[in-house]
């Protein structure tokens, strides 16, 4: 079975950190991108943090979003353009 390439937005938040912890234990998932609005040049699980962008999401099959409502709309615009699936966990809409 092929692995699911996963991008996690808001990766430094409580839910983002939990998603990373769970994903690295799951053999069916490969984290290909971690995004955060701040703390660039930081590395988590061997992956450098990026800002939300086409480059960050290009290799992902699925984007899991745990950011803010404003940021979620940004993620959705990029995901739509790239035809990526998105799981939204953001609250506060």
Tell where the protein language model's regions lie, with residue ranges.
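N-terminal Rossmann NAD(P)H-binding glycine-rich loop of SDR-like oxidoreductase domains
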Residues: 8-21
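Glycine/small-residue-rich loop that forms an oxyanion/phosphate-binding "nest" at active or ligand-binding sites
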Residues: 61-93
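Short acidic low-complexity segments
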Residues: 46-60
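NAD(P)-binding Rossmann-fold cofactor-contacting core
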Residues: 22-45
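Residues in the short beta-alpha loop(s) of Rossmann-like NAD(P)-binding domains
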Residues: 12, 35-38, 92
């Amino acid at each position: 079975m092929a692995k699911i390439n996963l991008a996690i937005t808001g990766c430094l938040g409580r839910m983002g950190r939990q998603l990373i912890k769970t994903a690295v234990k799951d053999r069916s998932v490969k984290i290909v991108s971690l995004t955060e609005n701040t703390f660039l040049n930081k590395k988590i699980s061997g992956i450098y943090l990026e800002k939300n962008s086409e480059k960050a999401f290009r290799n992902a099959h699925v984007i899991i979003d745990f950011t803010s409502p404003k940021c979620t709309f940004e993620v959705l615009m990029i995901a739509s353009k790239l035809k990526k699936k998105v799981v939204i966990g953001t609250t506060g809409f």
